[in-house]
Amino acid sequence: ESAGRHGAVPLITHRPNLGVEVDYIIECFRQYHDEGIAWREMAIIYRVKFMGEEVMNRLRRAGIPVEWLQGSWESRHFDSSADSVKVMTMHSSKGLEFPVVAIPGVGYLPWKDFDPAEEARLLYVGMTRAMEHLVMTYHAESSFAQKLVTAIERVAA
């Protein structure tokens, strides 16, 4: 179901590890930037801190301007005119929207010892931050990743 959004069919792709997932997202973001989408219109939304650290390290090494919004206050008070990719948790992303959103590590969901229904709602929050393009990646197999692959294949057909 579309959740009332319009835009490109979401992308979901399997990669061998989290680092390669982030590298794929960087490739996608560079392509969107080359097509005229500003860095400030892109966000990477993650579930747990180690993912955010991997994202930040790789974006910095790639020379992409980036701002890590590590808390709820920061996610509400950032400079939206600063031309940088915004990186934040799924929780912090609530209420925000970006033309381009990437979510790495979908295969980690549902996160250990957390209610799968709550994790599904949290993933939904992250996914619906995307107004035009949604890129998701996974390397670990999970019920969430498989359901997303199936749903996107159905929509794209």
Language model segments and positions:
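Short beta-alpha junction loops
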Residues: 138-142
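Core RecA-like ATPase module of SF1/SF2 helicases and allied nucleic-acid translocases
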Residues: 1-4, 16-122, 127-135, 157
